[in-house]
């Protein structure tokens, strides 16, 4: 239990901007971080949901409301996953060989492809949030999407081999076993039940669409890079949440 709590503290300090007391990082805590990843999603989702509610009461235009609501998940996570999205887009869209793509993936400079990709992402996500406000969609979707995406990404992260260049990814997955996978599956099943209760069968449809989207992202990155990494996880998470948001606009 102590190591699980340490893993949660490490996850909060790593994946959010929430100030946390100092915790010494070690392998015992690191191997529990992925189990805690859906909890991080719950925190991000609650902040997104509450932000939606509060901003929706402001006497400002729907355009400004949409922009403010859209950036909440990026702000609370310190742009961490957005950085991974940009790095992966830069590498894949370069259309180079595998070795060069891996070099681009680790390169800290920002390329044109990543900038164009994030602009497209922002346009679509802004439009989806605008639709949420305009058509009064169920805001609980904003609470559940970050949980679902992180749960699925965490499962893939501890299941699929990490690329050798991803030292941090190996650090998180070292010492994980079948028990961690079972816990993540049970967590996803619980979320699935709750999501279904709130949204009915449409909730299950959205969950399946997000699962397929993340799975396709991971499969594409395995083909391109030979494995998974922190950047790949961030890329898959961002795309999964965007697809989930877009699906919610279409089907709810």
Swiss-Prot record:
EC identifiers of the protein: 2.7.8.26
Membrane-crossing segments per the record: 4-24, 38-58, 60-80, 113-133, 141-161, 190-210, 232-252
BP term (GO), one: cobalamin biosynthetic process
Keywords: Cell membrane, Cobalamin biosynthesis, Magnesium, Membrane, Transferase, Transmembrane, Transmembrane helix
UniProt subcellular location: Cell membrane
Pathway the protein acts in: Cofactor biosynthesis; adenosylcobalamin biosynthesis; adenosylcobalamin from cob(II)yrinate a,c-diamide: step 7/7
Any one GO MF annotation of this record: cobalamin 5'-phosphate synthase activity
CC per GO annotation: plasma membrane
Membrane association type: Multi-pass membrane protein
Cofactor(s) annotated in UniProt: Mg(2+)
Similarity-based family: Belongs to the CobS family.
HAMAP family per UniProt: CobS (MF_00719)
Function text: Joins adenosylcobinamide-GDP and alpha-ribazole to generate adenosylcobalamin (Ado-cobalamin). Also synthesizes adenosylcobalamin 5'-phosphate from adenosylcobinamide-GDP and alpha-ribazole 5'-phosphate.
PANTHER family membership: ADENOSYLCOBINAMIDE-GDP RIBAZOLETRANSFERASE
Protein name per UniProt: Adenosylcobinamide-GDP ribazoletransferase
Protein species of origin: Clostridium botulinum (strain Eklund 17B / Type B)
């Amino acid at each position: 239990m102590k190591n699980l709590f340490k893993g949660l503290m490490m996850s909060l300090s790593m994946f959010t901007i929430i100030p946390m007391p100092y915790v010494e990082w070690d392998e015992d805590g690191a191997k529990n971080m992925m189990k805690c990843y859906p909890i991080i999603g719950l925190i991000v989702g609650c902040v997104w949901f509450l932000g939606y509610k509060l901003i929706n009461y402001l006497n400002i235009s729907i355009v400004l409301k949409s922009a403010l609501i859209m950036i909440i998940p990026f702000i609370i996570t310190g742009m961490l996953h957005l950085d991974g999205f940009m790095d992966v887009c830069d590498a894949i869209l370069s259309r180079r060989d595998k070795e060069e793509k891996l070099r681009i993936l680790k390169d800290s400079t920002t390329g044109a492809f990543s900038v164009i990709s994030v602009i497209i992402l922002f346009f679509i996500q802004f439009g989806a949030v605008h639709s949420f406000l305009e058509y009064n969609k169920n805001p609980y979707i904003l609470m559940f999407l970050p949980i679902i995406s992180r749960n699925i990404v965490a499962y893939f992260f501890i299941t699929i081999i990490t690329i050798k260049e991803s030292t941090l990814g190996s650090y998180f997955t070292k010492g994980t076993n079948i028990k961690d996978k079972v816990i993540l599956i049970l967590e996803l099943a619980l979320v699935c039940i709750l999501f279904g209760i709130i949204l009915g069968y449409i909730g299950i449809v959205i969950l399946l669409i997000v699962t397929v989207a993340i799975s396709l992202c991971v499969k594409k990155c395995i083909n391109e890079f030979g494995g998974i990494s922190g950047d790949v996880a961030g890329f898959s998470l961002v795309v999964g949440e965007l697809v989930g948001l877009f699906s919610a606009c279409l089907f709810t």
